[in-house]
């Protein structure tokens, strides 16, 4: 075909005619793409396109017609050699700039090739030799084109003639120039559609004879500019001006995929595509970066990579001004502004703005994972996932932060890290105005509002908000644990769990609180900790409106309303609403206590219990109340303490309507109604409402007092008793009454004191109906009915109703007076006696009569005084029935009957 057309052209010259309209040029065998088509080519396909163009050019050279495509038609008269530029090539070069590729790339390969034109054999003269310096004109004009300047129109227009000197067209005679100017001005009237379809071949004559410019330049013969379309498609009826374009067009009709990959069986339209594809299997990377030594399979990938070193981002978005290294990235970015998502999944209807995203998404439905790791044989749905995974084995971290020098193995990780320095959060939720640093996080957050859970497990039908959650969930069914610790060989189902676990070995705590300086191993722990400073509670229960700091805590709380207990013990059948509770419960059966204290070798079944225990040795109290500055060892203590200030009582008894600040208090209170005492002492069979009471009671039998005061070496059976005792030395009274501002060293004392203001007496005797402010008072009162005296003196065998009475009695034998007055040095055997004595020095009289405003230093004096106002005579003589207002008068009266004081 090519040789036949070349022969026709030689015949045309022999007959002295103008070149035929359909003469073969490099354009005729070039495969050209529209801008829209070019955008869909990936870097590998663009590199392949370049190679095909060069191969076509070499074929033209082989049939000896390349000079007719490259140079201007020179109608020679035998004058010497001259250098010319094919302006049509320049115009086409400028018209076909597409993305980051242009014919300049091809021109670099062939611009030094010299062509020899032989004179027509009929004339017998040697034609002048033309050397093609550059296919595309000067580099200045090429740069102007990239800069946005358009000095030369795509067709023959008014600006063409004005730029002839820039195109290096030499020795143009005035007559020729005039005709050329006329032709260009006439050609400017050609319509836009005609300009696109026309391929002008500018013929500048050098003849001194009767052959000035060829008449083919005249606009009225526009068919000269129009190629003959002599290659029709039988399927669609569309015609093309060269066979290569026809072959390209026919591929979709024919479905001809004749080149097959021997490894994976994939089919390709072109041999060159297959050659590029094979590099995926062979791992061949012939293109190497001189800066960092990294290799690439395709030259276009190397070109893009170079921009990482140079920082060049030549592609700019006209909407927002954002710049990109690759044109494909710009095209993808533009879809954000347009909102266009042309690629739709036939399975679920989800739409995407990229074909690659659709292909990747479809693998979720098919489960195909074509990319396999050669080291651990793990398979992935995307090649990029495999590339990221490979860096785990190699330890490569190619992306470095310019701010802090930290390196990352993914570009996305570096981009995420940069946001920590900038604090930028450009993505905002329209529902709740919450802002996010990543778009994916915003999309995930939106599902909280919509309730959408698009990812469903095929085994158990559980639905999830995120694909990562589904992937993690699948490992529950498969039992897969692919991540292994090199230190202790422990395996994990998540990579994040492995990374966190490694910090146990390294001791690394990379997350630091800016408020208090505390460091944490996990970012989630830091986020949760920050809420302690801000008191932020973002998660709200829709049933009771209670708010929580963590979503996981809300999920656990919701099960209180639903009574759902999904975690069941296989040993005893007991069910739990939390996985951690089940794990903890299992250790009761196994007796396992894996957590050991390095200070005292004590072992614990829970890690949290060990962490709490360690603070006994260190004295650390990291949890501080922002209201009164009291510090606590545990967060639960701080949470409980906070309710003192807020007065919050969220737990309500369904029997009597009483409310409590703590759930444990409600559970304990319910047993009062039921009379339930589930916990029994193994020594004396005494039953108790709470397990902790049994533990305390057991120490009476064993005599164990493990808690010792560092100040006075006094020991206690309960830790709470030691804490209360320490306040005697420190003088600390952290509990304050909001009514009278009186302070107390114990919370229980404050609660009892509050009942003085409220008049509340919640404890009632079932035998006589008497009510009491304190539970201990009721217990003591019941012994009056039963006659029980549980506390016996080991010296004189005297028994007492209360333990405090026994303790006081023992001091008679020991003569101990531990309570000493700082003012006068007088000592007392009871704290109450010392308090009463202090009032002598201070003159304090805290007890006031509401009737006459008289004040007293003792409560007993106030009670005796009140009888004057009420006329009450509670003390009655059993002999004669006479009543008296005070007990001393009754005793004096009884002497008349011969009754002594101790009878």
Curated annotation (Swiss-Prot):
Pfam families: KRAB (PF01352), zf-C2H2 (PF00096). InterPro entries: Ikaros_C2H2-ZF, KRAB, KRAB_dom_sf, Znf_C2H2_sf, Znf_C2H2_type. Broadly expressed. The keyword rRNA-binding does not apply. Residues 24-98 form the KRAB domain. It is found in: Nucleus. GO terms for biological process: cell differentiation; negative regulation of gene expression; pancreas development; regulation of transcription by RNA polymerase II. Keywords: Disease variant, DNA-binding, Isopeptide bond, Metal-binding, Nucleus, Repeat, Transcription, Ubl conjugation, Zinc, Zinc-finger. Transmembrane segments: none annotated. GO terms for molecular function: transcription cis-regulatory region binding; zinc ion binding. There is a cross-link at residue 173 (Glycyl lysine isopeptide (Lys-Gly) (interchain with G-Cter in SUMO2)). GO terms for cellular component: nucleus. A zinc finger (C2H2-type) spans 231-253, 259-281, 287-309, 315-337, 343-365, 371-393, 399-421, 427-449, 455-477, 483-505, 511-533, 539-561, 567-589, 595-617, 623-645, 651-673, 679-701, 707-729, 735-757, 763-785, 791-813, 819-841, 847-869, 875-897. Residues 121-154 are annotated as: Disordered. It is linked to Genetic variation in ZNF808 is associated with non-syndromic neonatal diabetes. Transcriptional repressor that targets mainly transposable elements. Primarily targets the long terminal repeat of endogenous retroviruses classified as MER11 elements which comprise subfamilies A, B and C. May silence transposable elements through the establishment of heterochromatin-associated trimethylation of 'Lys-9' of histone H3 (H3K9me3). Can also bind to certain gene promoters and other genomic regions. Represses transcription of specific MER11 elements during differentiation toward pancreatic lineages in early pancreas development. Belongs to the krueppel C2H2-type zinc-finger protein family. This is Zinc finger protein 808.
């Amino acid at each position: 075909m090519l040789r036949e057309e070349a022969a026709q052209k030689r015949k045309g010259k022999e007959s002295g005619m103008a070149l035929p309209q359909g003469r073969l040029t490099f354009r005729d065998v070039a495969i050209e793409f529209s801008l829209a088509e070019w955008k869909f080519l990936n870097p590998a396909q663009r590199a392949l396109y370049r190679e095909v163009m060069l191969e076509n050019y070499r074929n033209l050279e082989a049939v000896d017609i390349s000079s007719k495509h490259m140079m201007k038609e020179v109608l020679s008269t035998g004058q010497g050699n001259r250098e010319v530029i094919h302006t049509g090539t320049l115009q086409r070069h400028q018209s076909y700039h597409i993305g980051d590729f242009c014919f300049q790339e091809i021109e670099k390969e062939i611009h030094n090739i010299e062509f020899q034109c032989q004179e027509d054999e009929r004339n017998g003269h040697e034609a002048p030799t033309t050397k093609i310096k550059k296919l595309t004109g000067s580099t200045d004009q090429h740069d102007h084109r990239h800069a946005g300047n358009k000095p030369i129109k795509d067709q023959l227009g008014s600006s063409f003639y004005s730029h002839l000197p820039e195109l290096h067209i030499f020795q143009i005679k005035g007559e020729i120039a005039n005709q050329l100017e006329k032709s260009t001005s006439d050609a400017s009237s050609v319509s836009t559609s005609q300009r696109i379809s026309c391929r002008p071949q500018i013929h500048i004559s050098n003849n001194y004879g009767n052959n000035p410019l060829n008449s083919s330049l005249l606009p009225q013969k526009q068919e000269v500019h129009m190629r003959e379309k002599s290659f029709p498609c039988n399927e669609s009826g569309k015609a093309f001006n060269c066979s290569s374009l026809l072959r390209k067009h026919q591929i979709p009709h024919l479905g001809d995929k004749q080149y097959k990959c021997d490894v994976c069986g994939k089919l390709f339209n072109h041999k060159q595509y297959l050659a590029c594809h094979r590099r995926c299997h062979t791992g061949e990377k012939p293109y190497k970066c001189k800066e960092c030594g990294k290799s690439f399979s395709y030259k276009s990938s190397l070109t893009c990579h170079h921009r990482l070193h140079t920082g060049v981002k030549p592609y700019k978005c006209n909407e927002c001004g954002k710049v990109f290294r690759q044109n494909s990235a710009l095209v993808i970015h533009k879809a954000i502004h347009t909102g266009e998502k042309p690629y739709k999944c036939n399975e679920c209807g989800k739409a995407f703005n990229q074909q690659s995203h659709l292909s990747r998404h479809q693998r979720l439905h098919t489960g195909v994972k074509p990319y396999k790791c050669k080291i651990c044989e793990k398979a992935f749905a995307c090649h990029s996932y495999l590339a990221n995974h490979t860096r785990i084995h190699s330890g490569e971290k190619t992306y470095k932060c310019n701010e802090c020098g930290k390196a990352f193995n993914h570009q996305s990780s570096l981009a995420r890290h940069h946001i920590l320095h900038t604090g930028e959060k450009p993505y905002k939720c329209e529902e709740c105005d919450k802002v996010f640093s990543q778009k994916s996080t915003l999309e995930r957050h939106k599902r909280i509002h919509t309730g959408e859970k698009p990812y469903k497990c095929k085994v158990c039908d559980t639905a999830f908000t995120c694909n990562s959650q589904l992937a993690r969930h699948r490992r529950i069914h498969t039992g897969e644990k692919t991540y292994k610790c090199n230190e202790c060989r422990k395996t994990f189902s998540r990579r994040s769990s492995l990374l966190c676990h490694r910090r146990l070995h390294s001791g690394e705590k990379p997350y630091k609180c800016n408020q208090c300086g505390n460091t944490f191993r996990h970012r989630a722990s830091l986020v949760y900790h920050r809420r302690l400073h801000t008191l932020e509670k973002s998660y709200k229960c829709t049933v009771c409106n209670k708010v929580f700091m963590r979503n996981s805590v809300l999920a656990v709380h919701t099960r209180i309303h639903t009574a759902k207990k999904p975690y069941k013990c296989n040993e005893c059948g007991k069910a739990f609403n939390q996985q951690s509770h089940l794990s903890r419960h299992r250790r009761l059966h196994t007796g396992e206590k894996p957590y050991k204290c390095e200070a005292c070798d004590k072992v614990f079944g829970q890690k949290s219990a060990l962490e709490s225990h360690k603070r006994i040795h260190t004295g650390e109290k990291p949890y501080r109340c922002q209201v009164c500055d009291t510090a606590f060892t545990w967060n639960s203590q701080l949470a409980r303490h906070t309710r003192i200030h807020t007065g919050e009582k969220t737990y309500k008894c369904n029997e009597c309507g009483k409310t409590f600040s703590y759930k444990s208090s409600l559970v304990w209170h319910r047993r009062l109604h039921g009379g339930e005492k589930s916990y029994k002492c193994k020594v004396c069979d005494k039953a108790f409402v709470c397990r902790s009471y049994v533990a305390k009671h057991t120490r009476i039998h064993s005599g164990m007092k493990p808690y010792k005061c560092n100040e006075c070496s006094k020991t206690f059976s309960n830790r709470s008793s030691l804490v209360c005792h320490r306040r005697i030395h420190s003088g600390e009274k952290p509990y304050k009454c909001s009514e009278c501002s009186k302070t107390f060293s114990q919370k229980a004392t404050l609660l009892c004191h509050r009942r003085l203001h409220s008049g509340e007496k919640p404890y009632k005797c079932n035998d006589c109906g008497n009510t009491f402010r304190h539970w201990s008072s009721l217990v003591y009162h019941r012994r009056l009915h039963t006659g029980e005296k549980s506390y016996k003196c080991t010296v004189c065998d005297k028994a007492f109703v209360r333990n405090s009475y026994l303790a006081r009695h023992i001091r008679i034998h020991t003569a101990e007076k531990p309570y000493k007055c700082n003012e006068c040095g007088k000592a007392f055997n009871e704290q109450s006696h010392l308090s009463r004595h202090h009032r002598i020095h201070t003159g304090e009289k805290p007890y006031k009569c509401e009737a006459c405003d008289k004040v007293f230093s003792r409560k007993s004096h106030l009670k005796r005084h009140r009888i004057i106002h009420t006329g009450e005579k509670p003390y009655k003589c059993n002999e004669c029935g006479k009543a008296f207002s005070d007990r001393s008068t009754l005793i004096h009266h009884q002497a008349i009957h011969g009754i002594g004081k101790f009878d």
